[in-house]
Amino acid sequence: MLKHTAKALVCALSLTVAGIVQAADPIVIKFSHVVAEHTPKGQGALLFKKLVEERLPGKVKVEVYPNSSLFGDGKEMEALLLGDVQIIAPSLAKFEQYTKKLQIFDLPFLFDNIQAVDRFQQSPQGKELLTSMQDKGITGLGYWHNGMKQLSANKPLREPKDARGLKFRVQASKVLEEQFKAVRANPRKMSFAEVYQGLQTGVVNGTENPWSNIYSQKMHEVQKYITESDHGVLDYMVITNTKFWNGLPEDVRGVLAKTMDEVTVEVNKQAEALNQGDKQRIVEAKTSEIIELTPEQRAEWRKAMQPVWKKFEGEIGADLIKAAEAANQAQ
């Protein structure tokens, strides 16, 4: 009798424990970003959510908050470190206070094209940067392309002297401030969500952005000219809170890491196509004149802005800059 009772208790306990496991709340990952869903980052966040919830049903729930709907670009880093959000994908200009080395991505005319950026990011030096902020509580999960930056303004920008005196919106980056000062323009820090209104009201006269940002934020409606300068890159590092990441069950962390790697490949594959598509949509809208620089004009811009490299060489490291330059040579 006691034997049967013990067996019954064991079975009941097993069912209870199983019920508790089944009823356990899923791990919630809040993924916050500041751009539209149509952009490479917006599409990447949605794909990450889809794949994670398919692969970890009931275990992990991913909530995506686009367009600064949860945190703006001035608050999202603090929110990540406080644990109020688990994944964000700030532009590479946003890490200045955590590591000076990531300023390398803001140096003007360092990379010839997005393929060179990709080669550097996949190099040992590029991958090392992903883990360079773990002592600050930040773990990098991957680089997502947004695209090469174009200059826009309400006057034609063909030569460096054309930018003189104009007010350009910049991210909070000392490198980008110096980039515009090099052509005697006036940099103005402004959050991404405020750029359209800033351009519309004349608080700023111009900006720098990839085609997808220009189109998705309708900047072409308030900018008469866009110069296809490809003078710099605006990419993102997808990051998480180190304590949160290390505290995840090992199997869950493994699935998330593998999924992020797959999504990164897809985002970076689609980014250039999306940018070119948005460029064409801007052309068809006929609200802005697209200016193509001659090789000689582009060389003038490069000559005017390249001295910025020397100003930040000590903080970034000459060897790291050389490694980035080497990525311009196709393998």
From Swiss-Prot:
Gene Ontology CC: outer membrane-bounded periplasmic space
Keywords linked to the UniProt accession: Periplasm, Signal, Transport
Gene Ontology biological process terms, A to Z: C4-dicarboxylate transport; transmembrane transport
Subcellular location field: Periplasm
Observed effect of gene inactivation: The dctA-dctPQM double mutant shows no growth on malate and fumarate and residual growth on succinate.
Pfam families: DctP
Gene3D superfamilies, per database record: Bacterial extracellular solute-binding protein, family 7
Coiled-coil residues: none
Induction: Expression is maximal in early exponential growth phase and declines with cell density to reach a plateau in the stationary growth phase. Induced by the C(4)-dicarboxylates succinate, fumarate and malate. Positively regulated by RpoN and the DctB/DctD two-component system. Negatively regulated by DctA.
Signal peptide: 1-23
Miscellaneous note of the record: The DctPQM carrier is more efficient than the DctA carrier for the utilization of succinate at micromolar concentrations, whereas DctA is the major transporter at millimolar concentrations.
Quaternary structure annotation from Swiss-Prot or TrEMBL: The complex comprises the extracytoplasmic solute receptor protein DctP, and the two transmembrane proteins DctQ and DctM.
PANTHER family for the chain: C4-DICARBOXYLATE-BINDING PROTEIN DCTB, PTHR33376
Described function: Part of the tripartite ATP-independent periplasmic (TRAP) transport system DctPQM involved in C4-dicarboxylates uptake.
Family to which the UniProt record says this protein belongs: Belongs to the bacterial solute-binding protein 7 family.
Name of this chain's protein: C4-dicarboxylate-binding periplasmic protein DctP
Organism of this sequence: Pseudomonas aeruginosa (strain ATCC 15692 / DSM 22644 / CIP 104116 / JCM 14847 / LMG 12228 / 1C / PRS 101 / PAO1)
Gene: dctP
